[in-house]
């Protein structure tokens, strides 16, 4: 798996909108299975940063994995997305996986 961070919009010197961080899961062949993604807005002023909103999304790329639930939260200078994915064999549920991804913004607007 890998983490990918993308900054979509930088509105002003103190507001960062649409910062995205995604974790994608691959099978042994290197094909993507599903991902969970957090999109967050931040404010920062050189002394501190605050996450003002966080949204979760998830997507499955294969028919035998389904996204069962997503949730988001924010705290301080971070936003988190959590997804629950279910695995199926011949349409029968065989197990699930929960994964989270968290995005941070520092006091200068640097996202990680």
Task: Describe each model-derived feature in a short phrase.
Residues 1-28:
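N-terminal prepro-regions of secreted/extracellular proteins
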Residues 3, 35, 78-80:
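Intrinsic-disorder/low-complexity, polar/charged segments enriched in Ser/Thr/Lys/Arg/Asp/Glu/Gln
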Residues 8-12, 52, 57, 84:
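Compositionally biased non-globular segments, especially hydrophobic aliphatic-rich helices
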Residues 19-71:
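Short helix-loop boundary/capping segments
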Residues 30-32, 91, 109:
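Residue-level signal for glycine
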Residues 49, 77-81, 109-111:
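Hydrophobic residues embedded in beta-strands of well-ordered beta-sheets
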Residues 71-100:
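Extracytosolic low-complexity repeat regions of secreted or lipid-anchored proteins
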Residues 100-112:
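Short, low-complexity, Pro/Ser/Thr/Gly-rich segments in the mature regions of secreted, periplasmic
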């Amino acid at each position: 798996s890998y983490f990918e961070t993308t900054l979509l919009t930088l509105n002003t010197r103190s507001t960062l909108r649409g910062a995205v961080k995604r974790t994608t899961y691959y099978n042994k062949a290197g094909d993507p299975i599903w991902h969970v993604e957090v999109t967050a807005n931040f404010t920062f002023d050189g002394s501190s940063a605050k996450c003002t909103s966080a949204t979760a999304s998830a997507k499955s790329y294969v028919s035998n994995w389904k996204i069962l639930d997503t949730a988001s939260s924010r705290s301080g200078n971070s936003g988190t997305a959590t997804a629950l994915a279910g695995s199926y064999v011949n349409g029968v549920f065989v197990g699930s996986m929960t994964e989270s991804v968290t995005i941070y913004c520092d006091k200068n607007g640097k996202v990680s």
